[in-house]
């Protein structure tokens, strides 16, 4: 019946609804239709491609970061396969996870090219997971396969929160950028302050907040407090990003941003996302933090463009006044 509907041109939304009502597999039952605005059918197709072709291993390298006094930050690739990458929503308590890198930072990376989003845990004990997402934005003069895409993801949990924050410190140094984090967890700032590294933390995205929350008053603080309105805005930003066409393949078919996601955990989170259980979706929360930084740049650019236009009009008016026009 489902194949008949598909052959007759049923929409992705209709097919997803059928999967929820008549699931053939547990993964189909896992998907959510109520509060999930992401393109589920397209994401499922991408997940199947990643699984069948082993793209998570082909495109990404697992490893750990360390700091060398002479060489700076070093990425130590897990050649002996000692680390366990978390690929699914079901996690064993002894799995600490690892960093997966899809693209290392380019040489002499300009400040602001990369964005880091961080979803911290609230206490040392517990089963919640930490997630970091490193996003490479699009900057003039920088051309590469991963522009406007995710270049690294960490998903896991260390024994102490200091160890969790240390990952963000090294990522920020390696990619020459700052970390945007959910600031409901106060010890993130405390850690970086103690390390005299507050410059590695991103300031609150005032433009994004003002646009998402009416009558918002903002002050310059580190990180971002995730309100309902901001999560709603973040979800919409992610949806728009997923569906962006970035190129066309050899057959002339469009390639979307979601077709360049190779992390199975993120794909599963996007497919099964439920706003009512948002705290379960660690990578999405980190991605929202990264996307907010991208959007903040767009909003700042729009403001600058408008300011330039207004300045131009004022100069023209003044010039005409001098000419007696």
PLM features: residue spans?
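RNase H-like, metal-dependent nuclease domains and their acidic two-metal-ion catalytic environment used
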Residues: 1-204, 245-325
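Short alpha-helix plus adjacent loop in nuclease-associated cores
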Residues: 201-248
